[in-house]
Amino acid sequence: MINIQMIGIDHSRASVEERELFSFTKTKQKELMEAVVRQQSVDGCVLLSTCNRMELYVSLDAKAEPDLYRIICHCKQISGEEEKRLRELFTVRTEEDAVRHLFLL
């Protein structure tokens, strides 16, 4: 069974300045997606990035639970207290909820 997960930050929970911390150039988008698919049990991923949101959708093996937030922070060189503080701004969706959200955008 496929497991779909989404992690994202958007205008409803984060300021422009906070969202800018997680904006990605084309090169950084590629680096992030390559880092994600290198994780064991990850089949693929898609990154959606606009001025209002950044959302990472990942297809995983059924029981896999990689820490996608840590992978994102590593690619953006965010760590320590800042990493802990910003985690609460992110939304995580799984399975049908993640797919439904994607199609409502």
Label every model-predicted segment.
Residues M1-L105:
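N-terminal ligand-binding/catalytic initiation module
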